[in-house]
Amino acid sequence: MTKPRTLYDKIWDEHLVHESADGSSLLYIDRHLVHEVTSPQAFEGLRLTGRTVRAPQKTLAVVDHNVPTTDRSKGIADHESRTQVEQLAINAREFGVEYFNELDPRQGVVHIIGPEQGFTLPGATIVCGDSHTSTHGAFGALAHGIGTSEVEHVLATQTLIQSKAKNMRVIVDGQPSEGVSAKDIVLAIIGEIGTAGGTGHVIEYAGEAIRALSMEGRMTVCNMSIEGGARAGLIAPDDKTFAFLKDRPKSPKGKAWDEAVAHWRTLHSDEGAHFDKEVRLDAASLPPIVTWGTSPEDVATINGEVPRVESAMSEAKRVSIARALDYMGLKGGEKITDISIDRVFIGSCTNGRLEDLRAAAKILAGKHIAAHVNGMVVPGSGLVKQQAEAEGLDVVFREAGFEWREPGCSMCLAMNPDRLEPGERCASTSNRNFEGRQGFKGRTHLVSPAMAAAAGVAGHFVDIRTWR
């Protein structure tokens, strides 16, 4: 009798080219996404050694990190950023790789355009020189970030040397209450397991609450797997997955589609499959979540308070809390709802999709941002922007006092003009709240799109379940 396998086991086995005595393995890579920041040296390595891209049709390039989200007809002011963008265009043209430049309507954040185009498929191995490649695991793909030297290796060979990770399952049962989103669920998971909880593992997300999520919500959860320490995150594909992918530009068509779906239906963990680690959460008991510190595990409920240094169980944790409080300009015992904000950022590969913008616009309709708050909405792609404008969401945002921007990574990270000033506090829908992540001495609180929008109007964090 065949040994029961996890979803991760199945995808790994299907892509295993060779297994070495030292435990390392050579995996075949189905899809490779590249952007302007981590690919220049990789392409230059190919050039210097006289190599070509082995499978150009399995590689897709896009600019996202460095591009401005304001008027692009003026170009990119920063020399290094401009050079990286120009070099990606040169490399894509020279090596025959499809490329979405900053003026292409399909351009956007790399982890949003992959699924949009049907480039992301269930059961595929997907890599990108970006840690949030785990996003694509929402489709039942084994997806993770790689370094620049590995980018070169994949370009040249369409393979990657890997060591197999352990299996971890996070089961989220119950139905979340109104106002509790996928972002709250994943922040609660990270708060439970910590930023090292998934280290050495690939996480499979399962349970009633996960199955109930839309594909956009599932992408939000898988996106932040890396913040939980995991190499990748997975959700078994189902009819929602297939409906999302059907008729996408790069999805299989006709008979090939039917055959693909038949195979994709086998991509689930078998009954009795072994998981090295398992965690359970009840979504029904979750309130909206806000991070208070400088790590994604520093979470609090909206009706909670900032932790006190003396509440920590270890000296190391006390030191960590004290440092975070000092950086964030907060005091232990301060109510989360008493924390005022200066900026709102709605966007990123975590929460820059159409569903996210709809959730924020629903909160903002007929309201206006607080006088002391500056807000920006950055669609995750040109296609998201087009659809949002077709639905009139841009009008809602503008009338509420928000800036409506062009697609890109934007204020998720301080690699472009969108950044916080020292001491500014931001309600952000992105994925990392590290020191300086959004700008030198900037203070980041991670929240859902609806929570960010409401905070912008109130000028401080509020419980959207009761706030009007």
UniProtKB/Swiss-Prot annotation:
Keyword Lipid biosynthesis part of the UniProt annotation:
no
Cite the binding residues for [4Fe-4S] cluster: C349, C409, C412
This entry's Enzyme Commission designation comes to 4.2.1.33
Required co-factor? Answer: [4Fe-4S] cluster
Q: How is the cofactor bound?
A: Binds 1 [4Fe-4S] cluster per subunit.
Xref: InterPro entries = 3-IsopropMal_deHydase_lsu, Acnase/IPM_dHydase_lsu_aba_1/3, Acoase/IPM_deHydtase_lsu_aba, Aconitase_4Fe-4S_BS, Aconitase_4Fe-4S_dom, IPM_dehydratase_rel_enz, IPMI_cat
- Which major enzyme category is it? lyase
What catalytic activity is recorded? (2R,3S)-3-isopropylmalate = (2S)-2-isopropylmalate
Q: In which pathway does it act?
A: Amino-acid biosynthesis; L-leucine biosynthesis; L-leucine from 3-methyl-2-oxobutanoate: step 2/4
The answer, when asked if Transferase is one of the entry's keywords, is: no
The molecular function terms of the Gene Ontology recorded here are: 3-isopropylmalate dehydratase activity; 4 iron, 4 sulfur cluster binding; metal ion binding
Mind listing the UniProt keywords for this protein, alphabetically?
Answer: 4Fe-4S, Amino-acid biosynthesis, Branched-chain amino acid biosynthesis, Iron, Iron-sulfur, Leucine biosynthesis, Lyase, Metal-binding
Coiled-coil ranges (or none)? none
Q: What domain of life?
A: Bacteria
An example GO BP is:
L-leucine biosynthetic process
* Family affiliation: Belongs to the aconitase/IPM isomerase family. LeuC type 1 subfamily.
Q: What does this protein do?
A: Catalyzes the isomerization between 2-isopropylmalate and 3-isopropylmalate, via the formation of 2-isopropylmaleate.
> What does the annotation say about its assembly with partners?
Heterodimer of LeuC and LeuD.
Protein name, UniProt field: 3-isopropylmalate dehydratase large subunit
